From Swiss-Prot:
Entry protein name: Serine/threonine-protein kinase SRK2E
Native organism: Arabidopsis thaliana
One of the GO BP terms on file: positive regulation of abscisic acid-activated signaling pathway
UniProt keyword annotations, A-Z: Abscisic acid signaling pathway, ATP-binding, Kinase, Nucleotide-binding, Nucleus, Phosphoprotein, Plant defense, Serine/threonine-protein kinase, Transferase
Gene: SRK2E
Top-level taxon in the UniProt lineage: Eukaryota
Annotated effect of mutating residue 176 to A: Normal kinase activity, and normal regulation of the ABA signaling pathway
Ranges for region Domain I: 283-318
Length: 362
């Protein structure tokens, strides 16, 4: 099970000795920029800082990510702290999840037992349920966007709200975003869709991968065949291998999630009442009110929305005397002429944007 690769040179953020945060190590990079583990010199707390190059990269997705993320305070969501403007980058400071990605944990294990998969799925649904209650749909839920803290029984943390949409602030989603393996059928079609219902599908893909150790709609013989993956998604073609032994209740839940018609797909509230989900449900996940009261006042974002918007506006201006020399991968999938013809003939309703690309994030 592979992740998309990102390569190429990258401008590193300029830091100063007087900065509040000091570098511990680099912890990742992607289409967004670079992420670093930093230490708060005042509190000695470790934080994760995502750096996005100033200028054209500071777009509506970045603004949406920051504003939506700031509004969310839940134990299963990585906590937003603040944004900072450096001479070269916009820095987003957030909680550090020391346990790494759920993706890596599955890769190391091969696949999870049903009980372990349920343990993490319960937390994922708790976090997603809270997001939806706050009128935020994530739209890019996947294993790489679910982190773990460092505790013995790891707490799952949803991160990366770069493609999320708030139904309060934004219109119904219509663009095709998300990692192909996790995209719901309706997101591939040229019509508006309910982002909350699409999130349910992505949660189902995550559950399947935890149980099976492979993506549900990829052909095992041709995992890189993008056209075939999309065809299988639209036709809901998946199977649970014979070597994977799971309960009938679990199979039933998966079958209720992988439903092409969004109106007939199981909802988050229905998942939370499903017998498989309720088994061994931790007490602190039973009531959303108890979850959101676990944060004290010190966890409140210190910056107002107005302050954040001002910083973002300044970040849209490139650093003086510099220009963007590095154009690294955006995470979009190029579709060649032959593939586009095949897609048009097989899948007339596939939504390809004006650039000829289907957008997905990493």
């Amino acid at each position: 099970m592979d992740r998309p690769a990102v390569s190429g040179p990258m401008d590193l953020p300029i830091m100063h000795d007087s900065d509040r945060y000091e570098l511990v190590k680099d912890i990742g990079s992607g289409n967004f920029g670079v992420a670093r583990l930093m230490r708060d010199k005042q509190s000695n707390e470790l934080v994760a800082v995502k750096y996005i190059e100033r200028g054209e990269k500071i777009d509506e997705n970045v603004k949406r990510e920051i504003i939506n993320h700031r509004s969310l305070r839940h134990p299963n969501i990585v906590r937003f702290k603040e944004v900072i403007l450096t001479p070269t980058h916009l820095a987003i400071v957030m909680e550090y999840a020391s346990g790494g990605e759920l993706f890596e944990r599955i890769c190391n294990a091969g696949r999870f037992s049903e009980d372990e998969a349920r343990f993490f799925f319960q937390q994922l649904i708790s976090g997603v349920s809270y997001c939806h209650a706050m009128q935020v749909c994530h739209r890019d839920l996947k294993l790489e966007n679910t982190l773990l803290d460092g505790s013995p029984a790891p707490r799952l943390k949803i991160c990366d709200f770069g493609y999320s949409k708030s139904s309060v602030l934004h219109s119904q989603p219509k663009s095709t975003v998300g990692t192909p393996a996790y995209i719901a059928p309706e997101v591939l079609l040229k019509k508006e869709y309910d982002g909350k219902v699409a999130d349910v599908w992505s949660c189902g893909v995550t559950l399947y991968v935890m149980l099976v150790g492979a993506y549900p709609f990829e052909d095992p013989e041709e995992p890189k065949n993008f056209r075939k993956t999309i065809h299988r998604i639209l036709n809901v073609q998946y199977a649970i291998p014979d070597y994977v032994h799971i309960s009938p209740e679990c199979r039933h839940l998966i079958s209720r999630i992988f439903v092409a018609d969004p109106a007939k797909r199981i909802s988050i509230p229905e998942i939370r009442n499903h017998e498989w989900f309720l088994k061994n449900l931790p007490a602190d996940l039973m009531n959303d009110n108890t979850m959101t009261t676990q944060f004290d006042e010190s966890d409140q974002p210190g910056q107002s929305i107005e302050e954040i918007m001002q910083i973002i506006a300044e970040a849209t201006v490139p650093p003086a005397g510099t220009q963007n020399l590095n154009h690294y991968l955006t995470g979009s999938l190029d579709i060649d002429d032959d593939m586009e013809e095949d897609l048009e003939s097989d899948l007339d309703d596939l939504d390809i944007d004006s650039s000829g690309e289907i957008v997905y994030a990493m």
